[in-house]
From Swiss-Prot:
Region of interest: Disordered: 21-70
InterPro entries: DUF4606
Skewed-composition ranges (Low complexity): 35-51
Protein name: Uncharacterized protein C8orf48
Compositionally biased tracts (Polar residues): 25-34, 61-70
Disulfide cysteine pairs (residue numbers): none
Source organism: Homo sapiens
One Pfam assignment: DUF4606
Length: 319
């Protein structure tokens, strides 16, 4: 129930004024009663030995006091009636304000009028759930034999199946569905939205990622420059012509003597074939007892080729 704060303040002020007026009325009535009792007691306690003038005064004063008290009582009665009317008006106004500011509480009662079938189904479902919870608690508390435990477990499973297999009316499901549909937008609206460009953590992570991407880019650029320099250096120092020149350094010259050329070739062939270790294929062939040479060609044939090679070179040179 939502009541306006201004109305609440006015109610509080009116209530305070009425309470003050009632308090003053009580005090005044008490004073009148005490004064009337005091006057009556004073008149009774007067001694008979007083003078005549004093007696006359005493006779006159009670009549005056009685008249005053009667007028005061009439005034207080009128004031009391006015105060009671004020209280009645205040209570009526309060009831009217309460009824005026209570439309929301009546709406749910009108909306939540459901059918008897729906109420019965809901009640049966709740009772099943309560019984299931009680059975689970009892089964946990009991410490019996294995057979009893198995039996209780089967009973609990059967009761769970019965509880979950109970039919729920479509009206109840639809009502719950629409209620959830109404509450979800409210929850989404009330939820605090995360704005990435205002979040300091997101901005810090974004800066770190940008820095790492910048460093990777610069690193790849420098590596590409270094690789290009190495490729250029290799091409300039180890090009095709230099390779051909290095290969031609070992070749014999046209002005060399054929006997010197032959001597060099024989020395190279001896050094080359004497320093090699035997391969695995050669070892297998020797184990098998084969007498074939370890090379694909025999030594005499190789010598014959080496002998022929300088002649060919010489012939080409002569040509």
């Amino acid at each position: 129930m939502a009541i306006c704060p201004e109305l609440a303040q006015t109610d509080k002020s009116a209530l305070a004024n009425l309470s003050d007026e009632t308090e003053t009325l009580k005090n005044s009535t008490d004073e009148v009663q005490t004064s009337s009792s005091f006057s009556s007691s004073g008149g009774r306690q007067s001694s008979p030995l007083t003078s005549g003038s004093k007696l006359e005064r005493e006779k006159q004063t009670p009549s005056l006091e009685q008249g005053d008290t009667q007028s005061e009582l009439l005034d207080y009665k009128n004031y009391e009636k006015k105060l009671s009317k004020k209280w009645i008006n205040y209570l009526k106004l309060k009831d009217s304000n309460f009824e005026r500011h209570q439309p929301d509480t009546k709406l749910p009662t009108e909306i939540t009028r459901v059918s008897d079938e729906e109420l019965n189904a809901l009640q049966s479902y709740c009772t099943m759930k309560i019984n299931l919870i009680h059975r689970r608690g009892d089964s946990k508390k009991k410490t019996s034999s294995r057979h009893k435990k198995l039996h209780l477990g089967l009973d609990v499973e059967a009761s769970e199946r019965d509880a979950f297999s109970c039919t729920v009316p479509d009206e109840l499901l639809n009502r719950i569905y629409f209620k959830n549909m109404r509450t979800t937008p409210k929850q989404e609206a009330a939820a605090k939205q995360h704005i990435s460009y205002q979040c300091p953590y997101c901005n810090r992570k974004r800066a770190e990622l940008a820095l790492s991407a910048f460093l990777k880019q610069k690193k790849t650029l420098l590596e590409s420059f270094l690789l290009q320099e190495r490729i250029d250096e290799h091409l300039h120092t180890k090009d095709f012509l230099t390779r051909i020149g290095e290969a031609h350094q070992d070749f014999p010259r046209l002005s060399d003597d054929p006997r010197i050329i032959w001597k060099r070739l024989t020395e190279k062939s001896h050094i080359r074939y004497s320093g090699f270790e035997r391969s695995e294929t050669e070892q297998k062939l020797q184990r098998d007892g084969n007498s074939a040479c370890h090379l694909p060609f025999s030594l005499p044939f190789l010598k014959r080729l080496t002998l022929i090679k300088p002649e060919l070179v010489i012939v080409n040179d002569n040509v």
